[in-house]
């Protein structure tokens, strides 16, 4: 049959027209919408907008089923015009790029034509309407390397392209909106067959079956009865088919269904995804077996063999009692050893699916507990029909006999848990229908439905291979669309649907087995009968599945909750709280009362849980009646999420439209609309509704801990699956077993790593670590066949496969630009570019500064190549570049959910306030507000703790007694932070006097009565900009300043600056009000003062060394994983595919290698995500569409002189620019190549480490000029110019910045190199070769060789940086011990150097002391008088320095800990008795210590209790938080503190933290060893005994020696300290110090203004001193913790560092501005040269056991002056 012979491919004219041309509605929209919003727009553009919005509204009207008795036209019309045409304006906005306008539409009022949307700028050079030009501009690379930019107008074709895609999105989302319980309600299982949409679907699917059309009101039963029964012969079947008369099938653009009822899209997607793909991995449960001559599913059969009640209830192994576990063990043994034929048949398939799909199968194989007798990757369908023999049974028994019983139970549990998400579970277990239908001894089983659906979505290709077509409707090519319609509608076709022979639905093997009397010649007849019975039920099955999955909903406008005029008239008020209460009352009255409520509870299914709403457990809270509240009662009381604009029906449509068509989304929105809480919900729902993905995984980053926890709590509670619930036994909230929402930060987590559908909210550092290890966010395994040129195995080479770690990455609060965030956004671009099934969602309160950056940076991500692949846009030549990636979730024109009144100063008033007096002005304004208003809390923004302390004192002294001022900053305890966050609850019970609010609890001696305070003033740093929502907040006072800490890589110190805030920060502070009610914002500055202030990028403010050394690759011969040659998205490769297809010039078996040379690293991703049908030998399946393009090449024209209309219509510029100039290079296997990380071309980082000193071209990203930043010192600029050979700043105006060298990264890497963390090694081209021993095809081998030979040329003398072996192993130690304190490389070096001496725990103690008291004077007892200071100093002065003081202190504390058995916890096995005792009590529901209860409850809820590894999980879960009680330890510490004049509280803090960290180390090392011994890790890197390496390679000869004594422990501590901190050396100049590596002048810090002596215990300063840390205040550098050293010690301790410092002419100090200090240091360096020992250097590098660095050093020292060779 010729293509499309049955399809009428119509235009949009066929769509039913509710609003007709020039009718009253049409005129109204023209007059009141288009002409009002765009009054001066060109008439042709107005007409375009009007016609388009009419088309969209008609589509909505038709697709959502308006025009019926239940949903009359007037209902939709009222919805469109209520609230000042709010929804109509929202639809209009959805058709256009995002326009940042106000409520009055002032910008739109000025628009004259649509072309100007992209073009018009304001006086500041910013685009008036949209920033789309930044990702749409035309670019051309000039000969000088500069990129020229030409503006692209917004032409009509772009608008129409987007309109077509929008209409498709409406069809895709129709009748499936998120249930908001306002105007979107779930369709109930009990009455779906009464709905018009059901009846229309029945008619549609049967309208082609018979010439006598059936009445649309007939039920499915009636339509079935009206169909003629097929005759019993092939001839009669043929005659019956030929009698059918057909109409051609109408479609719009070959994909969109203009017929009533469920769309063909929904029908196909449900069949393909819900009924076939979703069940594939568990389908053995619906296999049929013959029992009493009838088919019985394996599930029902096994229910007779096992007690499935616990499994079906979702109870895990850990939740069974002993009798239940014994019973299950006995049942399994009986089943495993049974001689029953049916048992053996089921066992065979159980074994096969267990081997293939059990989550722990690989671990069991490594442990030799699961024995494989065949490859589980075999196709299951072959296995289904394998003949069961004694041999196969014996294989299965042998394979499973050693598998632990809990693993058997776990597999059953996992399989049933996933199976419970499917329609098959619903029909068998809930609907209690073992058979779907039966007639004349023919039974339709669930397995028959599966086979029908599988057959429907499969075909036999030209090679005779049975092949599955794409899963999604819009991924089907037109020929498959026709094939599917022929099958679904059962249209006779001699090729595609002929029932006289074996047809597409062919289950002959099944028929032979279950209908053995059927003759071979009658098989077509029997197939037809089965098919007909299935078709009679398929509509019901589809509806049941959509309802069961919780995605079929009914949008029915409800003016009583959405019409503001109606609400205002009903309540007689505009009060926000009264409005919310009225809405709650309406919801309760209409939906949640009486029978209506019962129907929704018992017959509506929740998409999240797959259960009815009555199965949601009540929310538990101490404040609820009887501590419980049912979910529907919660919805009608305390929540407001259902009313947020994010849940508005038009907002939802717009969201799903963007989600479906974009891989990167930029989401902004008004304050309180639900950006942080509702967007994640919509994404979770989109995965199920749009992606049909029941196992979607979303991760969302937050910049700080409070919003991480609060958002997880809020979202989970709003979803009805709270992560915490009140526990009456402990009178506290505890974690629940709900893991749909999870969270994690450094100190706490609520995570189930086995969960398959979740939203995980984490602090951004957590995700960054994961992304470093998972470059494409997919699964990866080591490639065992990868070798180098010499045949050595390369265990770091991997292959990357489908199966995402996360499907969606959300970066929330992105405007804050902390370093982790921007690195995530950087790494995410490469991940998403390669892995087209992942999405990046950037959520920000404001995007004014960032949007141009995002648009430029993510241009490379081509939305046309999103998975699922879209044949729809390919066939219709639509380009997703023509739709905007930005979504603004707000009512049109609104900036906040509630009204905010702004009060800015005039420019004259603003000029009076500066960094010296803003504190006083802030205090004054706050006092004025507090005294002039009567209710509502106040939030005052200050810059730091000192400001806050001053403000609290002043404000509390000058405000009424019912108002209390409290501080909020990051250093506060978690308890105090929680008090502030929940101040609306805690204020009434707050009883401190105002004067006492900052005292420690132990110092409180008096109290005010409860209820004294009714208002709070929160004085906060910028940490409150995004981390808290204060429910009673009415006023914000913003001083407009912030403290910024900036790292100076020249001086090597952090400087603190007080600077004006950015505009985005100002908007964030403003956004603290207007979230839950209206409020006022008082800015102590004019708008003009901040509007141009740009965000300070944290990555440019920090020391990037530690981050960069993690990112850099480990081996010089590690090549790019993906380069232009093997990039499936590279346009030249796509063009090559098209050419090969046209010329037929290829060998199918070699095709993918012929195209990409080396696709091996991501072969699986290419096969499954870049082909319509996974078959790399079939060139017709390659998805080559990348967007509109033609033969017109931009370079042929001068855009300023010619008409580019043809080019603009047919090309999106990125395609040609990328092909020629935008080549993609991914990271390497072990990290990034050095030149990519250095990024001198400014193309890798979204925010460059040197971003704060450069001005960029926003269109191209290229550097335009140097920026002078107030927070950057002159010395940095001097060095920068020196490196670039620029003598004067005036020369900058004449240089080409294309070749300008930025220095922050090179400086960081130089520092890392001196610490031997990285190496500079020769990068030889011949090294970049990987061979694969399992590739025997010579052609394929030649292609891979061609790939590696074609990588960018590296000259023989070129150098590249890689991780040192030391760094690689230090990373292993960091991973093993998992302590934040060791994330600093100085600390991990010190700790590691101490391991060979077994002093690492002593070193940890000293580290903790320094961490707790960064300023040494914090060790002094603060209660002692001034005169005691001298006594204290005299007592602790020593000649060996401050580290010696800490060592001595530790040696006095340690005996106390030993004497009181506080170090016994280090013996992990000692915990077994506690574990066993508390486990027994927990399972008996007896009270145990609360922390133990939390741990056991977590193990119980996650299924880890009562398992083989339960003690391992227990140990891993312990967080040892030592709390000092009033006991013997406390008394001994008190005596010690008194005797030593020490700060007792500081000692107690130290003991608590040390014991916690020390235990953590023992715990982690024990776990690491356990994992090795029990083979729990797949990654061989994790199976390495890292301690053995350290002990062997970091044991150096002593540098501190004594003539008569062996070095003692202090000597070893000192030696390890010098080795780790040898870069921190200063030369003592008497009254000041000079840093040895850069000549920075450092003045001694003083104990106090009363004691001007230097702040150190060192009383015998030597010429050279090591300091531990430094800071900078008021541009003065201070150093802390001083240790005297000898010159020889430091030269021998780190000979590499001092080799480069002394001999390297490119050292930084040689390029600094020559001052007296620099001269002094250079002279010092020259003077120490004779003392430097090259011999020691060689011995040192040899001992490090790193041949590469040994060769390098030997090579470099060749030719040095002989005087140094001693």
UniProtKB/Swiss-Prot annotation:
Feature: compositional bias, Low complexity: 210-239
Keywords on record: ATP-binding, Helicase, Hydrolase, Nucleotide-binding
Xref: SMART domains: DEXDc, HELICc
Annotated Pfam families: Helicase_C
Lineage of the organism: Viruses, Varidnaviria, Bamfordvirae, Nucleocytoviricota, Megaviricetes
Name listed for the protein in its UniProt record: Putative ATP-dependent RNA helicase R366
Species name: Acanthamoeba polyphaga mimivirus
Location of region: Disordered: 209-239
Catalytic activity: ATP + H2O = ADP + phosphate + H(+)
E.C. number: 3.6.4.13
Positions of the Helicase ATP-binding domain: 656-865
